[in-house]
């Protein structure tokens, strides 16, 4: 029974110890772990994720600062339902989030107000499953990571219509206003705030504290200060003034309304800037009473900075106050109430931590770009930042610096799940804190608690709308394990805050040299999203700042560090200007380069260098591709466009009934299955105790410490999924591959099925292929298939459909599930049970009733016949109508499962009986909890025996067991373990770790008991939890067995796709010399123009493998060479390149030319003809135009469009045309008459007027034109 024979593969890789792949789902799992930080004790949590969001929004105080609500900690309880239950019932797999909040009063008048600490329920948060997905309303969804523009400063360049180059610097924050510095055609620099308000840069500089011209010019070291006296002024005659000579004085005047004395600042310009000083200016300057004047320096530097002088010329303000007022007016289009409020507005724009946030990333990027050393905690702009940006921009104008490449991956970062959830929580908490403040202000003098202030709906509504409607929360592609894993590793540049398809140009979509080892250059969709949606490379990781990094080996003096320590992950920025050797450069055993010249890469350049110049080396040749691209053997021989199709089509491969791993693989198939978590894997070393089709039980080995801290038995049971439906209606049907008594190691795969065999990905079937034409049936990529493939179910798949019917309460009364349906024959209801649900095992044909349901009819006046019936049969007859669920026109299959979920509707006596049960449940729980705590205390006493306390504290930092005290049973029993800090109880670090693990395990078990109690209570009082408004929900699962047939789409792994054009009898297929007929005939003309020669390599090697019973791994860019192929074909006794003479199955004669006959791995894709075939008889019509609907889902017709009308006109087929445009379409009267005529066998009536003409006439009448048909 056990097929636990792992596929041993002959590996062609030249690199013998490649780096291990990181966990492929780390992108999702790690991000979510970092968001919740559940494994970290509260006192050690980093200021990150959810904790950070709370910290930013709390404490919350009321307007008078009397009451303060502080945040202490958050925690979550176990989920109410298991993942499977949520999938079955259409629920969300979530955990209750609770926060410990402290409310205290700072006002001495409220002496009666005590400090309150409470646990407050904040609503459910969807919780990530171990597979990296979320279950939302019963469907598995994935939150895709977003690739967006990193916060920071960007320098760009554009060209004006007149040819002038314009430069700009844009500062993009995480939150807050955008500010852009840009030059115009007159060489003046402006600052744009939020892309609309424009002001000279110097005005902004004055507003932030560089008040007069002197301060501004000193920043750039542009002017010379001259003390005003005759001697000095005579020396500078002939030089230009760098700043205005201003006479400043204050005037007092009385405000007539208030009687206050107000002083106002007055400025008078004596001599304007850029004026050349002459003799007659000297007296003017001395008379004006100024102390100093500024003149231009005589150095060359000032010509670079001419833009600053030009900008000063345009600057309307002369002092900080004027600048502030000017900016305020620009922003608000109104005058400020007073100076302070104007300053406040400017301060809030860039310097307020509440309103502006660069984020850690933004600060890091700005420091890096401008060479600053500002502290990473400063998340707002500083004056220094603004000055340095202006200086850099001026360097740019003078061609002394370069503009940024916006598509460089150091300028783009990834928002993973955790960060997206943090942003949503921040929105929710901000809304909640507003309502908290309002409630605090209202409840001024009464006593209230944190619970009274908080409305849990606020957060959950934001989170639910994110998971339900956000473009990045997607219905998981669950066609096969590869599709799942690829979807979780996908990076999208679309979505909120990202690009839009229409606006994205060519550059953003293109492959960039920084994608090397980070984003796959091959795997991206064809069509409008090309290049905007990409996949993470196999070795890539996302670092704390959200930049994608890739691993390299360190190289020093021509020697590569081949140890595990020699690997370092670098971001695109850190990799700049480094010389990197290729992954397959030959090395000796010590890690030295064998050749004197090494092919290397430096940014976008590929120099050949000497070994001592190399700084880094790729860890593997597979580094540049994603998982899907790495699965294509001989990828190096395929054109990239076809490889793209290949990697996209492997995700559409349908899981087959009989899985078979490829003979020619790439070696990544095993890791993919392990990391996809679709199979059951051993969690540790142990022994299989029991195994059958639905269950595996394993007894795990545990060491003494693990046994001691655990509250769970060592025996673990796993349920094997049977015929489970996936999102795409595929089947997950696993079977065990282990035997009773077998020893297993950690990570061993214990099952197979769902595109998996022997622990490896198995998407298709190894088929014997001949590349030759066959009677024209493989013209244009069509595929000729041997009947054996159909007969032996080689490409057969099972699909499961789920049909749901909900029972609601309507205005006219309750709906009801029943097999007693009015006006339906007994024959039609023979397979229904008493609830009206079809029995398991029934064969379903189109039109059969799956679930019977009746609905109360509307009360209308009964007809005479109905009155008679009611008089005879009582009132019940005829007031319900049939609302059953029937099989759709193309549905044929077998019922494999049915489920019924009901809410409990109870009478008063039943409710009273329940009340008696509930206290018993509580007592049971208390008893179990007490036992559990006793075990904990016993174990803690063992651990703390003879130890002295180092000071056990609760979460507030209060000592509950004093430092230096001995641990006693009484002390340990008195502790509330939910609020105790678990670090440093004793001086023994090992014992501390054990204490932490023990208490954490205890709390987990305690919460599980608590959750179980709640569930039992819920089941008694309410019944099955169902979505709102639904009383019962019936589900029927129907399995369809799909054999491959004409019209189905098949493909190889190299982008070689085609449609099955004919299934040929086995004896008519071309056969080999030994009489073996080939399984599939492909057109050789599909190869040369497509340039995917990899398929030929695969076919040749595959045939050698099949003959010898060997499997191969040929990793991409490091796989089998031509010589290796020849060596293996020789071993197998096959001709070179497998060129073989075939015989015609029909005549038995040998063909003239030899053809390539090999074994290729072929996939059956999810575009099956059975899902697409469709014919309409009589069906629904569109309401207004009265034309038939379109599409299979609506049981619609085929569109006969404008061009088709021309074709019939060209043939002069007037009667057919008239028929098509009237009675077959929208002549309402005509079509019913035609039906009548067909039934009675009479000749067809003449067609009438199409409804579309009436629609047109009505529209014209609506415009006020009186139109009548004569």
Curated annotation (Swiss-Prot):
Instruction: Specify the enzyme's EC class, one word.
Output: transferase
Any single GO molecular-function term of the entry would be: DNA binding
Query: Could you tell me which Pfam families the record lists for this protein?
Result: RNA_pol_Rpb2_1, RNA_pol_Rpb2_2, RNA_pol_Rpb2_3, RNA_pol_Rpb2_45, RNA_pol_Rpb2_6, RNA_pol_Rpb2_7
List the SUPFAM superfamilies.
beta and beta-prime subunits of DNA dependent RNA-polymerase
**Disulphide bridges:** none
**CDD domains associated with the record:** RNA_pol_B_RPB2
Which Gene3D superfamilies did the record assign?
Answer: 2.40.50.100, 2.40.50.150, 3.90.1100.10, DNA-directed RNA polymerase, beta subunit, external 1 domain, DNA-directed RNA polymerase, subunit 2, domain 6, RNA polymerase alpha subunit dimerisation domain, RNA polymerase Rpb2, domain 2
Which GO biological process categories is it annotated with?
Answer: DNA-templated transcription
Q: Does the keyword Transferase apply?
A: yes
Q: Which reaction does it catalyse?
A: RNA(n) + a ribonucleoside 5'-triphosphate = RNA(n+1) + diphosphate
PROSITE patterns in the cross-refs: RNA_POL_BETA
Task: Report the GO terms under cellular component.
Answer: DNA-directed RNA polymerase complex
Which branch of life, at top level? Answer: Bacteria
State the UniProt keywords alphabetically. Answer: DNA-directed RNA polymerase, Nucleotidyltransferase, Transcription, Transferase
Q: Which InterPro entries match?
A: DNA-dir_RNA_pol_bsu_ext_1_sf (IPR042107), DNA-dir_RNA_pol_bsu_external_1 (IPR019462), DNA-dir_RNA_pol_su2 (IPR015712), DNA-dir_RNAP_su2_dom (IPR007120), DNA-dir_RNAP_su2_hyb_sf (IPR037033), RNA_pol_bsu_bac (IPR010243), RNA_pol_bsu_CS (IPR007121), RNA_pol_bsu_protrusion (IPR007644)
**Enzyme Commission code(s) on record:** 2.7.7.6
Tell me the function of this protein: DNA-dependent RNA polymerase catalyzes the transcription of DNA into RNA using the four ribonucleoside triphosphates as substrates.
Partners and quaternary state? The RNAP catalytic core consists of 2 alpha, 1 beta, 1 beta' and 1 omega subunit. When a sigma factor is associated with the core the holoenzyme is formed, which can initiate transcription.
**NCBIfam families registered for this protein in UniProt:** PRK00405.1 (NF001616), rpoB (TIGR02013)
By sequence similarity, the record places it as follows: Belongs to the RNA polymerase beta chain family.
User: What name goes with this protein?
Assistant: DNA-directed RNA polymerase subunit beta
Instruction: Specify the species.
Output: Phocaeicola vulgatus (strain ATCC 8482 / DSM 1447 / JCM 5826 / CCUG 4940 / NBRC 14291 / NCTC 11154) (Bacteroides vulgatus)
